[in-house]
Every structure is written in C-alpha cells, then in structure tokens.
Amino acid sequence: IHHLQVARVTNLSRAIDWLKEQGIWVAGAAGESQTRWFEFDFTLPVTIVLGSEGSGLRANIRKKCDALLSLPMLGRVKSLNVGAAAAVFFYEVVRQRLLNSQKK
C-alpha cells in the first residue's frame, strides 16, 4: 500500500486494452464527470489515466475508461495541473487501501 507503480506508454489505447485483459480497471480523470474521485473504489486493481493539461483525455481514450472521475474546483480555477491532479488521485488510492487494510 505504500508503493504505486507509474508507467508511461507510447500507445495508450493498446496499453488500456492490455490492462483490461489483465483484469485492471481503468479510471480516467475528466473534469466534467459527475462522479467525484473519492466515490470510486480504489481498493480494486486500477490504473488512473491522466490527459494533457490543455485538452485532457482524447475522446477515444475516454470511451475505453471504465469510469471517468472529476476533481471539482471552486472559484475561478477550472482544473488543477496534471501533477497536482495526479497527487490527489494517488493519495486517494493510498488512503482507501490503508483504510481497507485496517479493517482486516
């Protein structure tokens, strides 16, 4: 629970297909999603897909995701930069898995 694997791939679409074949859920960061980041079960085997800061996830990648999750913002800021968004998502993964391990 104290280690998260990070991967950079050259073909994201094929990588997502492979991950799904391995039984791994794919959660994409999408600001307009109605599902907030903490509502997803990150105790599952999951990968988080983050888009570019300017345009987010491409349409074909969004369609491949099992869930689209948002980090709602207040005020004039529309979104976090990708590094800050990654930190929020990764912290939530660790938080849920830590809570889950304490229940056992």
What are these regions (language model features)?
Residues 27-81:
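Active-site/ligand-binding-proximal alpha/beta "capping" segment
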